């Protein structure tokens, strides 16, 4: 099975949902081979899904890389690294600890062509699609993903392509090609599936979140290089916080890949003194 997914929230405060955890369990049980996500929220990685079984086609907001190093050097952070980046401007302001080259985010904006091997993993996505007997689309509108012909085996006759199953509340451009289309919420459908398979309902536990073991610590001189809220470790310590003793106002609504332009025209309220 080859899985295409889309989550309902792209905020850095989000945590893996029931659907994310169910997908991870289905992969563990060898019922799902590969997951393709168009989101940049890193939630599939945080669910515990192995990186080699995941293609984040539009990047991951927690990953910055050094393309000057060979092979490309990757740094996973506990905060959104896209604070200073935008279309065609991907430098994060931090430097590689090995070669001092500028680190860049991994986000692929509309109109850009992603070239990074990871976390995009286009090769893994295309190879998985070629081997798939079923494609399950969960919560994705497919308005963007439909354009990627290699994901749908469009080079084959219709009868030779993987069977398509879609779960989404709204219409998708692939509905007419689906073997089954369920108009429902992903968590509800996945919950019923877990019951049908007699699997224990998986629950996200922050103590098991792999991002804490994968994360690259900031160097002392980099501590003030961002103002994003840091994902708190399970023990509550903010080891990598830009301002351990203070608070960052309205961080979820500032710039970055998901909030660009949100604050335009908004008036900032003055604090009472």
Task: Enumerate the predicted regions with their spans.
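Conserved catalytic alpha/beta core of Sir2/sirtuin-type deacylases, generalized to analogous enzyme cores
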Residues: 1-273
